[in-house]
Amino acid sequence: MKICMIGTGYVGLVSGVCFADLGNKVYCVDKDQKKINKLKNSLSPIYEPGLDDLIRNNLRAKRLIFTHDLQKAIKDSQIIFICVGTPTKK
């Protein structure tokens, strides 16, 4: 299955990597190009035990794609998860 995770914070990144490890092709999308570049080099912006190894293995297997191209990721996906912060009223 092809899955799109919009947002590569804690929820989007960990969920996306786990979906990829289950054999799905996962697009992880973020507007922060620096974060995407780090993730493409297997450098996680968050700490979660074992996450770096899962990122590395799934990048190598071509099941995990980090991108800032939201339109392409949505077009190529069957399921889309929106994993961005929810604004609160002040």
Per-range role (PLM):
Residues 1-90:
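Structural/interface elements that position substrates and couple domains in central-metabolism enzymes
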